[in-house]
Amino acid sequence: MFRALNCDDHGAAVQQNAFGFPRKSSDRWTDNSTSNYRCESGGNGRDSGRNRVRRPMNAFLVWSRDQRRKMALENPQMQNSEISKQLGYQWKMLTEAEKWPFFEEAQRLQAMHREKYPDYKYRPRRKATAQKSHKLLPAASSSMLCKQVHVDERFYPFTYTDSCSRAAHTRMEDQLSCSQPMSTARSLLQQEYHSSSASLRDSPETLAAQMSADASFYSK
C-alpha cells in the first residue's frame, strides 16, 4: 500500500510537470520550519540572492515609487539615473507637511517588517575595491625624486683649487639629470668628492714645492 501511494504521488508530480506547472522553490522547504526561514531570509545557497530580504522602504522610497513610474512613462528616453536625480530634487522641494503622510506609511511598513522578520539584521553588501597596482614609478615621479636631491656642503664639502676642478664639477651637475635615480646621483657625487680630494693633493702649489725639493736634492 505504501508503494502504491508513492507511485500515485510520483504520477501526480509527473502530471503536474507535464501540464506546465513547475514546482515553486518555496514548496520544497515547507516541511522544515528552519529551512523555510532560511529560504525567506536569504540564507546560504545558490538562491540566496533571489530570496534576500529587502529593507523596508523609507519615506522617500514610498513617495518615489509612484512618481518614478509616472516620470518613466512621460519620459521614455530618460535614463534611470537621471530620473533618480530629478526625484531627489523634487523631494527636497516638498514641505514637511507634504512629506508627513509618506513618513507615516514608512513607519507602518517598518512595523510590519519587524513582525514578519523578527530576526532580521541589515547587512550591507561590501563594495568591491580595486587592487593596488605595484608598478614602477613613471618618468614624472622619477623627475620629482631627482629634484629632491640637494647638494649641500654639509654632506659633500667640495674644495676648488683651480678652474679645472670647478669645470669638472659643473660637468658633473649636468650629468645629474632627472632620469637618474637618487642612488645613482649619490654615487656620482661621492666619486666627484674623491676626485676633488685627489686634485687637492695634486694642486699646483703642492707640485711646485715637490719640484723645488727635488731640485735642491739633486743640486747637492
Curated annotation (Swiss-Prot):
DNA-binding region: 53-121
UniProt-recorded Gene Ontology molecular function terms: calmodulin binding; DNA-binding transcription activator activity, RNA polymerase II-specific; RNA polymerase II cis-regulatory region sequence-specific DNA binding
GO BP, one annotated term: sex differentiation
Disordered as annotated region, ranges: 25-52
A Pfam family of this chain: HMG_box
Subcellular localization, as worded in the UniProt entry: Nucleus speckle; Cytoplasm; Nucleus
Main localization of the protein described in the UniProt heading: nucleus
GO CC annotation, single: cytoplasm
Annotated keywords: Activator, Calmodulin-binding, Cytoplasm, Differentiation, DNA-binding, Nucleus, Sexual differentiation, Transcription, Transcription regulation
Binding partners and assembly: Interacts with CALM, EP300, HDAC3, KPNB1, ZNF208 isoform KRAB-O, PARP1, SLC9A3R2 and WT1. The interaction with EP300 modulates its DNA-binding activity. The interaction with KPNB1 is sensitive to dissociation by Ran in the GTP-bound form. Interaction with PARP1 impaired its DNA-binding activity.
Function according to Swiss-Prot or TrEMBL: Transcriptional regulator that controls a genetic switch in male development. It is necessary and sufficient for initiating male sex determination by directing the development of supporting cell precursors (pre-Sertoli cells) as Sertoli rather than granulosa cells. Involved in different aspects of gene regulation including promoter activation or repression. Binds to the DNA consensus sequence 5'-[AT]AACAA[AT]-3'. SRY HMG box recognizes DNA by partial intercalation in the minor groove and promotes DNA bending. Also involved in pre-mRNA splicing.
Family membership noted in the UniProt record: Belongs to the SRY family.
Protein name: Sex-determining region Y protein
Species in which this protein is naturally found: Canis lupus familiaris (Dog)
Lineage: Eukaryota, Metazoa, Chordata, Craniata, Vertebrata
